[in-house]
Each structure stands twice: as structure tokens, then as C-alpha cells.
Amino acid sequence: MPLKILVLGAGATGGYFGGRLAQAAHLGKSDIDVSFLVRPKRAETLKARGLNVESPQGSFGIPVRTVLHTELKPEYDLVLLSCKAYDLESSILAIYPGMRPDTCVLPVLNGLAHFERLDREFGALRVLGGCCHIAGNLTPEGLVRQMTELQRITFGLRPQNSTAGQAILDALADAFRQTPVDLRYSDQVLQEIWEKFVLLATLAGMTCLMRGAVGDIVATDEGTTLMQGMLAECETAATHAGHASRPQVHAATAELLSTRDSTFTASMLRDLESGGRTEGAHIVGDMLARARAAGPSTPLLAIAWAHLQAREARLKRERSAT
């Protein structure tokens, strides 16, 4: 029987990675069965125009199967969860009708805090390990646009997972190998997730705090020192958790965060500057809590988190006054 996958959403992340799986099936390269759980308006767009992806690895447009929350049945082997952290609760409610007792969930959210919540809801046996790297957006016309060359998905078994999860991930890996996606099927997936978490928390904390790209920050008198300091605080948390970054990864991260003229920023900065919601609590706030568990000296993470909280407090105050 082909693997039946439910992809939550068809936006920048779910639309890209789910779309690549659907494209492989559409071309006859894979027998994987992909459905997209979407809202009515997005379903109408996809029915009328198909799923359209603009990508440096090859743009495409294909018809896709969509399903509404009210139409879900418990018939899926795997749910690919790619929501923003602040939408986690509503996403859990959305996928529930599609979950069998043995359905696995593969979250590719940023950070780590979501694992505890998903484990409580579905059981740690069924919540697999994963993360992804992609910069993209969904245009007003419904086009999934990949903005850079980077498009990687990483997944693997967590220590708590069942053997059934292994078979599901094997089939998923086989399907992704028929696509242009950079696949990492890892036997140390928590290490990979932690290494991304360290990079992202440093990048988001500093670019939001300084309101600038990496190159803007390191061009200042104290920018490189501050960037290195926040990276060190995040690495302290990772080391305390037993997942210190591997030397080559740490070196690559440090270089990425110290490159002059770099326009690299976190998507959190774009969300912040556009007045949108951010994953501040899930990324910076959670990293601060984990770093403090390792030791009390976390001044830069504390400032970055206070900055994001102050922004939320101001928005709340201004909205309540109107």
C-alpha cells in the first residue's frame, strides 16, 4: 500500500515540500499519496489553478488533492506538520480527525518546544524528529515562491519512537529521493535539530534586536563581539542538553553569523517589521530558559527576549486603545 501523507497547509513550507512529493507522484516516480489540509479559500485556488511553485531547482504546477477539516477521515499514515509555532494548538485540532491510533506526526517547526506538546497529545512513540531549511513565501496570487537555493528537509527517529515510525520514514525518504529536495535522513536527528536551533536563536535574537542583517551588525564596532556572545549563550544550552554543536557545524555557523556585507536575516525580523506575529517565545524565549538551566549568565538572550516581549506589550496596548 502506498504511504498516505496529510500535509498541513499549502504555504511556503508545506506547499514546497509537500508539493515536491506530489510532483514526484504526478510524474510517476513515486507511489506516495499526498493530500493537503487547507482552508476553503486556499482549496478553491488550488482546485482552479493547481499548486504552483517557483523554485531555483525547477518551477512547476500540478493538480493536487485537497481536503477540508470537515472532510477529514482517519486514513493517513503520516501527517507533515509545518505550521508556525504560534499556530500549534489550532493545528493539533485541525489534524485530529485525520489521525488513526498509529498515525505518525513529523513536525518540521523551528525550535524544540513543540515536541513536548505533541508528545502529550499523541504520545512520544508517534512524534518523529524533523526540521527543515527553506526561505520562501506565499504570494497573494497563491504562488509558492522559494527565495534562495536552500531547500533541505531533515528527519529521523527520536529515541522514543516506535519501529513503525522507521518503516514510514524509510518510505518517505525513498519518495524524497525522487525530488530535487536536499534530504538528510539522519540517525542523530535531535543533534541536527539542536544545531539549527542554535543558529536560528542567535540569528533571530540579534537581527531583531539590532533591526538589521548580519552584515549590518558586524559592521558596527561591537557587533561581532555581541553576535559571538549570543552564539556562545545558545551553545551553552545545547551543551547542557547533550547536543553541543559538532566542530564543523559550529565553525560554519560562526562564519555565517560574522560575514561582512551579508544580507542574511531571520524571518522573525521580517514578521516583526511587518507588524505580524512572531515565534519569539518558541525560539528566543525557550532558548533563554534552556540556557538559564545550564547557568545564570545569559545577558544577551535576556535582552533579546525582553525586547520581543516589550514589542508585544506595546502592540497590545496600542490595539486596545483604538
Language-model regions, residue ranges each:
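NAD(P)+-binding Rossmann beta1-loop-alpha1 motif at the extreme N-terminus of oxidoreductases
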Residues: 1-59
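Nucleotide donor/acceptor-binding cores
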Residues: 2-4, 77, 103, 151
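Short, charged/polar "capping" segments at the starts of alpha-helices
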Residues: 42-47, 115-116, 239
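Rossmann-like NAD(P)(H) cofactor-binding subdomain of soluble oxidoreductases
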Residues: 58-144
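Internal alpha-helical scaffold of NAD(P)-dependent oxidoreductase catalytic cores
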Residues: 67, 97-98, 120-130, 141-251
